[in-house]
Amino acid sequence: MKIRYKNSKNIIDYLVMGICYFKNNKKPYYLIEEENKIKWVSEIYIDIEKSKMPFNWSISLGNNSKYDFLCGYYELCNLPEHFEGIISRNKKDLEIFRKRKNELEIWLEKLDYYNKEITFNDILSKIKF
């Protein structure tokens, strides 16, 4: 999923690595990396650009004191220490985050490639007579 985040400086597209409904909060927050800082941003500041959800994302439903709903890559949803570690900038957790982000970028590129509209002229242009 990609979002367009309107920060104080400008408008930039970001890759979403997780979606969270924190305890006692009815609005979703999106996990992004901005200028090498990982943070949760409120839906108030974003527009969703591409809403395709990765097939391998996990879901965690309120089995802790921090959130009621969490959706994202495996470690984010299944390892509470990783959830905390990415915000506290633990080196190991940042490596996992960046690895999963890279995998998601590759997946989105492939998805974009296969979702392109192919016309008859496109096919003909590839054929050599």
Model segments located where?
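Extracellular beta-rich ligand/substrate-recognition surface
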Residues: 7-9
